[in-house]
Design a protein with these regions (language model features):
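Short, solvent-exposed loop/turn and secondary-structure capping segments
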Residues: 33-36, 59-64, 95, 100-107, ...
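Noncatalytic luminal/extracellular "stalk/propeptide" segments of secretory-pathway proteins
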Residues: 1-62, 168-189
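Mature extracellular/periplasmic domains of secretome proteins
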Residues: 11-12, 37-43, 78-89, 106-121, ...
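Long, well-ordered, tryptophan-enriched scaffold segments
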Residues: 85, 89-98, 102, 108-188
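Catalytic-core environment of secreted peptidases
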Residues: 2, 42, 46-73, 90, ...
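Second-shell loop/turn segments in exported
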Residues: 7-12, 23, 32-38, 62-80, ...
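Stable alpha-helical elements in mature extracytoplasmic
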Residues: 34, 75-80, 84, 136, ...
Length: 239
């Protein structure tokens, strides 16, 4: 699998025919950092191809994004959100393990699993989501760039500069046709309190979450459960 395709758009079917692909670098518009990857580009009816993370991750020195520590501009969620604000028909993120911080297996697993969204009005859902969203492997991106007479690494280096401008990927086009199934799911939050003793005016918070992945491929010990504490909470402390 070289590409994963999904949609949170409020429609019954995603039908796109011959949508042109446009490389928009890191897909970031950050006025406060004097950065705009969308200079003079109209993405209506087009697919935005974007890099994961931000321009500082592989830079020789900290720049507009304060070094290697990822900003929200580097998150995949931001890439999808900004492309939707720009009116793109779709967005494809180029996967690379180091800047993404996870391998293709993770992308593939989440990309072939159901998506969840909060309940929205039709208008809000249309504004917040592009009709199509997904990821593609770097090798596929390299081939698409090569067919357009471009070197992927060279274009990536250009995207690390504030003067980067979007690049049409020549004759590269995307056509898709798939149905969407929607279900309303009701979940419940559980909140409880156990009063303390000697330090009753203080609190220790114990929390959990609905894991985004649930069941996956067996790990080294054969466990197929994608435990949230390992998935998301390894940076947390307990006391």
């Amino acid at each position: 699998v070289d590409v994963t395709l999904q949609s949170l758009h409020p429609r019954k079917r995603v039908q796109i025919k011959d949508a042109p692909l446009v490389f928009v670098g890191y897909g970031i518009d950050a006025p406060e950092r004097h950065w705009n990857d969308y200079k003079d580009v109209d993405l209506h009816g087009k697919i935005a191809v974007v890099l994961i993370n931000d321009a500082d991750f592989e830079a020789d020195a900290p720049g507009a994004f304060d070094g290697k520590a990822v900003t929200y501009y580097g998150r995949w969620t931001y890439k999808f959100e900004e492309a939707a604000r720009r009116g793109a028909e779709g967005v494809l993120i180029v996967h690379e393990t180091a800047p993404a911080a996870y391998g293709w297996a993770t992308v593939k697993s989440s990309g072939t699993s159901p998506l969840f969204d909060i309940e929205r009005s039709q208008a809000d859902a249309m504004a917040q989501h592009t009709p199509l969203r997904g990821w593609m492997q770097r090798e596929l991106a390299e081939a698409i760039f090569a067919d357009a007479g471009l070197d992927f690494d060279a274009e990536k280096r250009k995207a690390m500069r504030a003067d980067f401008r979007p690049v049409a990927l020549d004759n590269a086009k995307l056509s898709v046709d798939f149905a969407l199934k929607r279900e309303q799911v009701v979940t419940r939050k559980v909140v409880a309190k156990m009063p303390g003793g000697a330090h009753g005016d203080e609190a220790v918070i114990f929390s959990a979450h609905w894991d985004a992945f649930g069941i996956g491929q067996p790990g080294a010990k054969g466990d197929r459960i994608r435990r949230g504490a390992i998935d998301n909470a390894t940076g947390g402390g307990t006391g």
